[in-house]
Amino acid sequence: MDDWTEGEIRAIAVAMIGERYRRYRLPDAAAEAAMVGSMARYGQIAPLAVCLRQEGPEVLDGFKRLAAAKTLPAVTVLQARLVVADEPTAKAIILGLNGIGARMKELEEAWIVHALVREDGLSQHQVAELLGRHKSWVCRRLALLERLSEECAR
């Protein structure tokens, strides 16, 4: 996959696609079931967005499509578009791409902001700039997650 260029779409075996960023999204069983029906009827309409990590391609956008493909025996490959991104940018892309249609839940936004600050070491100001948001938005998302108990946040 070393010759895969940014923006290029390739067919990738479903079994090779990782979900390390799945933890930033809440499960939605109804939406996933609807996606299974759609993929069974129409096939894959839009490519996944993936970034490359040492383990292989990791989904940034298309978690429901990947989940649907895993339940459909006839679907063994998915089309994926490569996005070149470091860790903070990958998280920002998840927020940006998933905020287009059905808006992400505040808890999902908080998980990403928390990861950018606590795991990636960015300041709140840097996170605000990266995400194109106001510092107060970042502060509110951090406060939301940090006020929840550890048990509720997982």
Label the predicted regions:
Residues 24-26, 67-147, 153:
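Amphipathic, charge-rich alpha-helical segments that serve as recognition/docking helices
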Residues 1-83, 94, 100:
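Short, charged/polar connector segments at secondary-structure boundaries
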